[in-house]
């Protein structure tokens, strides 16, 4: 993987009129208009007989397929999915967003939901696609929570992941969940981000009570939660076999398995990401030779806006697609 060090990837130049990690996070996600994408929806049955929604974009036959794993409470409508697939379409490449359970307006049938270390979900999805499209070059990209889940799968699979995908990318992934959770539960972050996340997460937790005669969660307690730590301790951890929030955050974090990644992987994190303290980001000593670190000083959390007002979200998809294109000719 020596040639990874010589990648000629675009340099990120932030919009000078949008300073700061919060503005660079919120504006692209909530205020910037993008032309909507047209998806084709499929419903898949999971190995444990649950259901998820899967959205496809068009592309030319025989071209690569990009599998996108979205972030916390995200979907195929998230700004990062729209910007990536617009540019992929120009290349003729196809895209797919397999929604995590309870996302994409598909209520799931089981108490199980999704979590930041859900590598088992990533595994069956990617292997199903590989089986159904054995001659199609597969690439995987994960954003935020989906990025951590993808990285965890890559680390756990090691070299065998090369039999499934050509290359991967993770954007603004919370590889240290404790550092991320603690950052989101403090100060202005708690009001800007955590409160929004908990608004939909509480509703989904209430729905879970209807799926089990012996629920894992106490709705009266869940109604009172004000932090991600409390929610993960009361809901996420017990629903998915973890012994509380500390166990969940520790075991689900991908940072500890980054040295085991064998698939060419691009790791993009802004140093001013409000979700991830810069000191918690991995260094070259923390990753394998297959991992290419890209850590711009600015960009926010899954933001990376550039250009004059109103700005554009071109740098991130251009960088990811160039990385994927670079690894397309590699012989298996």
Residue ranges and their predicted role:
Residues 101-139:
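Catalytic nucleophile-loop/oxyanion-hole region of alpha/beta-hydrolase
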Residues 20-61, 305-311:
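N-terminal cap/lid segment of alpha/beta-hydrolase-fold proteins
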Residues 74-86, 278-280:
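The serine-hydrolase catalytic nucleophile loop
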Residues 297-332:
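Catalytic active-site module of serine/aspartate enzymes centered on a nucleophile-bearing elbow/loop
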Residues 3, 131-239:
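Alpha/beta-hydrolase-fold enzymes
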Residues 63-71:
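Short beta-strand element of the alpha/beta-hydrolase
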Residues 261, 267-269, 273:
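Short beta-strand/loop motif that positions the catalytic acidic residue
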Residues 77, 85-109:
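Conserved alpha/beta-hydrolase
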């Amino acid at each position: 993987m020596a040639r990874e060090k010589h990648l000629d990837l675009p340099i990120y130049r932030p919009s000078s009129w949008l300073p700061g990690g919060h503005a660079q996070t919120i504006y692209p996600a909530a205020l910037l208009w993008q032309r909507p994408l047209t998806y084709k929806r499929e419903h898949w049955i999971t190995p444990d007989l649950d259901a998820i929604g899967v959205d496809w974009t068009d592309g030319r036959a025989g071209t690569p397929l990009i599998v996108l794993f979205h972030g916390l409470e995200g979907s195929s409508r998230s700004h990062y999915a729209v910007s990536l697939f617009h540019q992929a379409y120009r290349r003729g490449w196809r895209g797919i967003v397999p929604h995590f359970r309870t996302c994409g307006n598909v209520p799931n049938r089981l108490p199980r939901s999704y979590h930041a270390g859900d590598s088992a979900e990533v595994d069956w999805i990617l292997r199903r696609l590989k089986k159904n499209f054995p001659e199609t070059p597969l690439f995987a990209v994960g954003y935020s929570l989906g990025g951590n889940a993808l990285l965890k799968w890559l680390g756990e699979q090691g070299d065998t992941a090369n039999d499934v995908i050509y290359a991967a990318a993770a954007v603004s992934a919370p590889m240290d969940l404790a550092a991320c959770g603690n950052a989101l539960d403090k100060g202005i972050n708690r009001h800007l981000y955590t409160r929004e996340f908990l608004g939909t997460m509480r509703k989904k937790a209430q729905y879970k009570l209807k799926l089990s005669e012996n629920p894992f969660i106490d709705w009266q307690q869940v109604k009172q939660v004000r932090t991600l730590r409390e929610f993960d301790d009361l809901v996420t951890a017990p629903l998915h076999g973890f012994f509380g929030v500390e166990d969940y955050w520790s075991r689900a974090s991908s940072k500890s398995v980054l040295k085991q990644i064998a698939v060419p992987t691009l790791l993009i994190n802004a140093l001013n990401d409000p979700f991830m303290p810069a000191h918690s980001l991995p260094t070259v000593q923390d990753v394998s030779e297959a991992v290419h670190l890209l850590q711009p000083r600015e960009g926010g959390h899954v933001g990376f806006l550039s250009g004059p007002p109103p700005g554009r979200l071109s740098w991130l998809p251009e960088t990811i697609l160039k990385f994927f294109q670079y690894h397309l000719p590699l012989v298996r």
